[in-house]
Curated annotation (Swiss-Prot):
This is Bifunctional protein glk. Residues 341-641 are annotated as: Putative HTH-type transcriptional regulator. It catalyses: D-glucose + ATP = D-glucose 6-phosphate + ADP + H(+). One of its GO terms (molecular function) is DNA-binding transcription factor activity. Its EC number is 2.7.1.2. Keywords: ATP-binding, DNA-binding, Glycolysis, Kinase, Membrane, Multifunctional enzyme, Nucleotide-binding, Transcription, Transcription regulation, Transferase, Transmembrane, Transmembrane helix. Its main location: membrane. The lineage of its organism: Bacteria, Pseudomonadati, Pseudomonadota, Betaproteobacteria, Burkholderiales. Residues 341-417 form the HTH rpiR-type domain. It is an enzyme of class 2 (transferase). In the N-terminal section; belongs to the bacterial glucokinase family. It comes from Burkholderia mallei (strain ATCC 23344).
Length: 641
């Protein structure tokens, strides 16, 4: 940790995009720090969580106390599982949206990770001075590492080596069911069951668990204990030699050893087991003399296996900051130089070839990408201190058609910060909040469709449509909107098409179809029995069915080709929103595919196109090229003379 003194070398190594906010948020306290450069962590402050209504309030208080200007990037390690955008703390009353918090604080980047995932990322960099070995064993290089730590809860994580980097495991292993190893622990379990229907290891070997053990032993000895006795009091009494407190600490450490052994054999942690958290360091010599290590190795046939695995107590000050700093640095590195963010790599490569004015726009895009995405051109020009035409020239220098095209590519490069899980809209959300959630949910669904769509099925569907004699689009209810949109696009290809949203008309028309005809059935549920019966009639007559629906539905299983668009809607009872967008996107993909096939006709279609040209006075290929240009909003390449 830096002392805060600035040397010339330190100044030279400062982050170009300004100081980064680091946070370690536990169930009791929130710790904050600023990282001014790699390894330069300063202004560490601790705030009691109970004094602030929200996490945002605590961060604002810290930024005010630290007297820091704008912070662009922040990362938070939190004592809670992190799955998606919404975080609701288990051991505290804070609940927040990551994206809403980022917007409220004006950050370009806000990462939130499990605190033990962050702590795990700090382990490879710990020196011998920052850890103390307990017992024997020798760690094996480039092997799995386990991490655990009792604090307000019982954190668990692990590190897996992968080439030249480490992958941290997010885990809630502390909630595994507690299994007693002796009669004393049986007594503790029975006592804890009076209060908790499920007794996890966290209940008995996190900080509050020591109080449960102490009271269970007191009840055994028929001793009365004051209601206000807590873990800190028990540890203090143990250090003073109190027999009951000493036994409680001994039992606590033994249970912790059992859990550590479980973690070691589960992960195959030949790189060692590390102990963090705030409780064990306060035990001092009591822990060193405890049965922790003996219980760790007590695994019967696997005793020799565990005897070779070392266990360490982390003694580094604020180690979670080191880990969360590494995670944030990797995220920002991927953005500016990783293969997954080509637009940022392109800006970096082109920067030296740009004019000085264009470089200022490039720097704004690299350091404040969301400002480029969200602001109108007048604000972008003002922030970069350039003219509006310079902004456009910069975009075109990167090969973009204009600012809108550049914004789209930039947003794609930022997908790592777009929540890839569903965010619920709640009563009381502002227009900013629920509007952002609707947009984020839609973007997330489209990105996931891109990752999971079966493009072999897409190719098959395009082949079927391109060779169809007639195409009919069926959609009931809200899906009829998609069917009508598809009809509007496909009829321009010169293929007879029609859309039906009425079940009676669908049944009447399907009875007339046969070989060479195609039905595109659009359905969110894929379970309407009437629609399935209509499709059966058409397929028995030789027609083919392309289904745009969810996976593993009766419609998907029955269709000739299924294009599956799985997603999450906010509520099943309301009109489909995300599914409609995904279905429209699928229609666009199919239409573009057919347009490409028809704009570059093969020899077998030449005669048919010649006849079409004679009748219509224009080439069918030219017509398809026009449709392709229309579908791509003018972005399709111009045909050569």
């Amino acid at each position: 940790m830096s002392t805060g003194a600035q040397t010339k070398a330190a100044a030279a190594s400062q982050h170009a995009d300004g100081p980064r906010l680091l946070a370690d948020v536990g169930g009791t306290n929130a710790r904050f720090a600023l990282e001014t450069g790699p390894g330069e962590i300063t202004q560490i402050r601790v705030y009691p969580g109970a004094e602030y209504p929200t996490l945002t309030d605590a961060i604002r208080k810290y930024l005010k106390d630290a007297k820091i200007g704008r912070v662009n990037h922040a990362a938070i390690a939190i004592a809670n599982p992190v799955d998606g955008d919404q975080v609701r703390m288990t051991n505290h009353n804070w609940s927040f949206s990551i994206e809403a918090t980022r917007r409220a604080l004006g950050f370009d980047t806000l990462l939130v990770v499990n605190d033990f995932t962050a702590l795990a990322m700090a382990l490879p960099g710990l020196t011998d001075a920052q850890r103390v070995q307990i017992g024997g064993g020798t760690r094996r290089q480039n092997s799995v590492i386990g991490l655990m730590g009792p604090g307000t809860g019982l954190g668990v994580s692990g590190l897996i080596p992968a080439d030249d980097r480490w992958i941290a495991l997010g885990s809630e292993g502390g909630h595994a069911t507690f299994a007693p190893m002796d009669e004393r622990e049986d007594l503790v379990l029975q006592y804890a069951r009076r209060k908790y229907p499920h007794v996890s290891f966290e209940r008995v070997c996190a900080g509050p668990g020591m109080e449960i053990i102490y009271r269970a032993l007191a009840a055994r000895d028929k001793k009365r204990i004051a209601a206000n006795v807590d873990t800190a009091d028990i540890v203090e009494r143990a250090h003073a030699g109190d027999a009951l407190a000493l036994e409680a600490v001994e039992c606590f450490c033994a249970i912790l050893g059992t859990f550590a052994g479980n973690l070691a054999v589960t992960l195959g942690a030949l790189g060692g087991i590390y102990i963090g958290g705030g409780v064990v360091p306060k035990l001092g010599e009591l822990f060193m003399r405890s049965p922790f290590r003996a219980r760790f190795e007590a695994k019967g046939r696997f005793e020799a296996y565990l005897a070779n695995i070392p266990t360490y107590l982390i003694t580094a000050e604020y180690p979670a900051f080191l880990g969360v700093s590494a995670i944030l640095a990797e995220q920002l590195s991927n953005r500016t130089g990783g293969a997954s963010s080509a637009v940022f790599e392109r800006i970096r490569q082109m920067r030296d070839a740009l004019t000085p004015a264009e470089r200022r726009v490039a720097d704004l895009a690299l350091n404040h990408p969301r400002s480029i995405i969200n602001d109108p051109i007048v604000n972008i020009a003002r922030k970069a201190d350039v003219s509006q035409p310079t902004v456009i020239r910069f975009c075109r220098s990167l090969g973009c058609q204009g600012l809108s095209d550049f914004k789209l590519k930039l947003a794609t490069g930022l997908t790592g910060t777009i929540p890839m899980s569903h965010s619920q809209v709640h009563l009381g959300d502002t227009a900013t909040d629920f509007g952002a959630k609707v947009l984020d949910n839609t973007v997330s669904a489209i990105l996931q469709l891109r990752e999971h769509l079966n493009f072999e099925h897409v190719e098959q569907a395009i082949d079927i449509l391109n060779n169809a004699r007639r195409i009919e689009f069926y959609g009931l209810g809200n899906s009829n909107i998609v069917a009508q949109d598809a009809h509007y696009k496909f009829f321009r290809f010169g293929i007879p098409t029609i859309a039906y949203g009425d079940l009676y008309m669908q049944a009447a028309s399907a009875a007339l179809l046969g070989k060479g005809d195609v039905i595109v059935a659009v359905s969110k549920s894929g379970r309407a029995p009437e629609l399935l019966r209509v499709l059966d009639v058409a397929m028995q007559a030789g027609a083919k069915v392309i289904a745009i629906t969810s996976s593993n539905t009766p419609l998907a299983k029955r269709a000739t080709v299924a294009l599956e668009t799985d997603h999450i809607e906010m509520r099943e009872s309301q009109l489909s929103m995300i599914s409609r967008i995904l279905h429209l996107v699928m229609i666009d993909i199919l239409a573009v595919g057919v347009a490409i096939r028809r704009a570059a006709p093969n020899a077998e279609l030449a005669e048919a196109m010649a006849r079409a040209k004679a009748r219509a006075g224009a080439s069918a290929g030219d017509e398809a090229a026009d449709v392709l240009d229309w579908l791509s909003h003018g972005a399709a390449p111009a045909a050569k003379d």
